[in-house]
Structures are given as C-alpha cells and as structure tokens.
C-alpha cells in the first residue's frame, strides 16, 4: 500500500514475531501502518485516508477520538494514571454496568477480554466444584489455554484453530458442541452433565462472522444448562453495548449466570469485566476463595474512558436505530451478488458462500480467495475492512450518511467486478 509501510514492516519482522503484536494484523504482503484516527477515518503513515469499518475490532462504537472520551482521558491524566488503590471511578463504572445488565449484581474489572473469560471459567469451577466446560466450535473466548480449541477469530484466519503448546491435559476438560445445535448439547449434558461447570457462549458469534442465533436457540440453551446445574456464561466482549444497551442478553431476553464484557466498556482503552449473581461473585478473592488479581485491573485512565463512553452512549438517543438502518442499506447493495449478507445492528459481514452460515463448519465453507480479492478492491477504494472472512465488520456512530452511501456503492461495484 505504501513504501513507508513496507519499510516499517521489514524492520518490525526483525523485532517482533511476524512483525506484529497480534496475528490478524499481519496483512500480506505487508500491513499498512496507521498514525491517526478521527471519526470514521484512519490515516496511514503516507497520509492515505481510509473509511474504517474495522473499528479496532469492535471497541470504537463512537468512532475514533470521540471528544467526550478524549476529554475524560486528558482530565484523568492530570491526576496521574496508576495508583494501585481503589478509585471512585470503579464505583461509577460498576454502577453503570449493573444498572444496564439485570443479570449482573456484582462486577470485577480486569484488563483484557481473555482475562475476563479466564476468570469467569475459574469462578464457575470454584462455584460448582465441577471441572469441565462447554464451548461452541469456532467460539473465540480469548487466548488462554482452556479455550484455544477450534477457536475462531485469528485462529481460523490463520488456519490454526488449535494452538501448539496447549496441553492435552488442559483441553480434555473443554467439551465442544456446534453453535445453533441444541440436540448435540442435550446429548452431551445428558451423558456428562455432572462433570460440567459451565457453558461459555458468544450469544452472537462475533469471531467467525457474525453468525446469529436461530430463533429460540439461546432460550433453549438457558433451559438446558439450568436443568443440569450448569452455569451459563455469556461472552459479551463483542456484543456488550454493540447490539444495544444491555447487550445480547437483553436483546434476546436470556439471563446468563455470568457475563464477560470488554471492548466498548473501555472507550478504546484496555478494560474488561466479568459479573454475575451476587452469590457467585462473592466467591472472588478477597471475599472468597477463587483468586483473581491484576496490577492494571481497574486502572484510572481506562475507567475514565469507559465511564465517559457509556455516558455518551446513553445520551445518544436513537444511535442504535441509526446504525441498524445503515447496515440495512449496505445489505441491500449486496443483494444478488453471489453470497450472503449477515447483520445485527452495527455488526455486518458479506460471506462468500451461497447461504447464511449457522455455525462454524458452514462459515468455514466461505471462499477465502474471493474474499481476499474483494478486500483488496475495497482497500483500493479507500475502505478498510477487517482483513479476514472470519472477522466481523463494525460501523460506528461517526459514520455519516455519505459514508454509508459510499460504502454501499463500493460493495455493489466490488462484488460485481
């Protein structure tokens, strides 16, 4: 894309594995390097302006450099940026999260989504006294050992759904079922339910698509897990505040036992959380025997950004309706283009397969060669999409009507070429 980016990548490959800090960023033959983001745009080292439909893989629902969030960060910086003590901002953000999620009565802040899901699983095991967990095939719940089994996101992009270095003694405690398949779930829990502490589930599979739940699927999962005394963990790191205030659990009317949140709740800074019923959460140290800790957990800068972002989201009445309308317009431009368009609110994707995928196996049938050619054409038109068939596209409140019109036109022309 630019000579400067090529030069940077040449240097970076000698300094960092693959030249990047996260695998999906290693766009071939070399990634472009970004120096600035503003609104719906990012800008490369050469000054190239791109309409951004990646949004840092989900956190930036308000767009880049949202002023109220930036102002909150600047104000917090004036007071120092790390104390190692509790802060009033922890209470502020906890109150917002609890008010917005009736399933959450207590919350613990951590730094990354991986930490949140790892701690949530540990908590479920500590609460139930059982050893095993269930995840869905292609479900991505971070980069810790117990969930790196047929994982989505960058694992699928690289063709490495199972990671080297993960011990078989660990993953044998991770059972898998296809998404949208309650019969397989029933069969598993009828046989092994006494060994299963929790099922961890992306209510909407954001890391292979999105792939949406079939009508009644989430409700049936809730019923099955409850009947077998299995905790239900909703991984809403992506869907939290993305599909609406209250997340997918509110949208679909399903109450999990534990929820993990991330991305949007930090306003673009590193912040995640997990929360749930009081009787479960009170097992977390120092209140209980399930240990979890972190130097940067609940750091003041991220909390300030998170409080500002969520207050701004609450203040923007109609934002989610506008975003839903925008992706509908883009979807209409994709009709009859030889693939399938999937959307939920501001999440969207064009799959290079004839019908909408309902699970991991079907999503993997997409033509990745066609996707790559399409992705390059869109980049030439000044549009940055996540560089994988298996990563969700995101719109933000900063995308204007003219942005949506341009995106729709580009989709139509690039899918026809």
Curated annotation (Swiss-Prot):
Xref: PROSITE patterns: AA_TRANSFER_CLASS_3
Q: What is its main location?
A: cytoplasm
Question: What pathway or pathways are given for this protein in its record?
Answer: Porphyrin-containing compound metabolism; protoporphyrin-IX biosynthesis; 5-aminolevulinate from L-glutamyl-tRNA(Glu): step 2/2
Q: What is this protein called?
A: Glutamate-1-semialdehyde 2,1-aminomutase
Q: Which reactions appear under catalytic activity for this entry? A: (S)-4-amino-5-oxopentanoate = 5-aminolevulinate
State the Gene Ontology terms under molecular function: glutamate-1-semialdehyde 2,1-aminomutase activity; pyridoxal phosphate binding; transaminase activity
Give the NCBIfam families listed for this entry.
hemL (TIGR00713), PRK00062.1 (NF000818)
Q: Which UniProt keywords apply?
A: Cytoplasm, Isomerase, Porphyrin biosynthesis, Pyridoxal phosphate
> What top-level class of enzyme does the UniProt entry assign?
isomerase
Which GO terms of type biological process are on file? Answer: protoporphyrinogen IX biosynthetic process
Q: Respond yes or no to whether keyword Isomerase is given for this record.
A: yes
Organism of origin is Methanospirillum hungatei JF-1 (strain ATCC 27890 / DSM 864 / NBRC 100397 / JF-1)
**What compartments host this protein?**
Cytoplasm
Q: Which InterPro entries match?
A: 4pyrrol_synth_GluAld_NH2Trfase (IPR004639), Aminotrans_3 (IPR005814), Aminotrans_3_PPA_site (IPR049704), PyrdxlP-dep_Trfase (IPR015424), PyrdxlP-dep_Trfase_major (IPR015421), PyrdxlP-dep_Trfase_small (IPR015422)
Q: What is its EC number?
A: 5.4.3.8
Q: Which CDD domains match?
A: OAT_like
- Top-level taxonomic group: Archaea
């Amino acid at each position: 894309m630019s000579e400067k980016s090529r030069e940077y990548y040449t240097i970076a490959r000698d300094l960092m594995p693959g030249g990047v800090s996260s695998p999906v960023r290693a766009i071939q033959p070399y990634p472009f390097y970004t120096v600035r983001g503003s609104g719906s745009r990012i800008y490369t080292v050469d000054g190239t302006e791109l309409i951004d439909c990646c949004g840092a893989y989900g956190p930036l629902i308000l767009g880049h450099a949202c002023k109220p969030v930036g102002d909150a960060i600047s104000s917090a910086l004036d007071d120092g940026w790390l104390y190692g003590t509790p802060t009033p901002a922890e209470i502020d953000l906890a109150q917002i999260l609890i008010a917005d999620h009736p399933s959450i009565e207590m919350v613990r802040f951590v730094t990354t989504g991986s930490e949140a899901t790892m701690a949530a699983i540990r908590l479920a095991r500590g609460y139930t006294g059982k050893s095993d967990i269930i995840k869905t095939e292609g479900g991505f719940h971070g980069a810790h050992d117990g969930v790196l089994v047929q994982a989505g996101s960058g694992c699928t992009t690289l063709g490495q759904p199972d990671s080297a270095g993960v011990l078989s003694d660990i993953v044998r405690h991770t059972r898998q079922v296809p998404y949208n398949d309650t019969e397989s779930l029933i069969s598993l829990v009828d046989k092994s339910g006494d060994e299963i502490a929790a099922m961890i589930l992306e209510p909407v599979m954001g890391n292979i698509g999105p792939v949406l739940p079939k009508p009644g699927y989430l409700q049936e999962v809730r019923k099955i897990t409850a009947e077998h005394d299995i905790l239900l963990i909703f991984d809403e790191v992506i869907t939290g505040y993305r599909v609406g205030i209250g997340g997918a659990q509110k949208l679909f009317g399903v109450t999990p036992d534990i929820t993990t949140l991330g991305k949007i709740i930090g306003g673009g800074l590193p912040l995640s959380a997990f929360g749930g019923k009081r009787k479960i959460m009170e097992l977390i140290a120092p209140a209980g025997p399930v240990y979890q800790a972190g130097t940067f957990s609940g750091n003041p800068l991220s909390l300030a950004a998170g409080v500002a972002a969520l207050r701004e989201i609450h203040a923007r009445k109609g934002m989610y309706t506008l975003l839903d309308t925008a992706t509908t317009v883009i979807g209409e431009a994709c009709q009859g283009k030889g693939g399938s368009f999937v959307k939920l609110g501001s999440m969207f994707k064009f799959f290079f397969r004839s019908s909408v995928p309902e699970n991991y196996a079907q999503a993997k049938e997409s033509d990745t060669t066609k996707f790559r050619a399409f992705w390059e054409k869109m980049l030439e038109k000044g549009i940055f999409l996540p560089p994988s068939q298996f990563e969700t596209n995101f719109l933000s409140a900063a995308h204007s009507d003219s942005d949506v019109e341009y995106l729709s036109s580009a989709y139509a022309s690039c899918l026809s070429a």
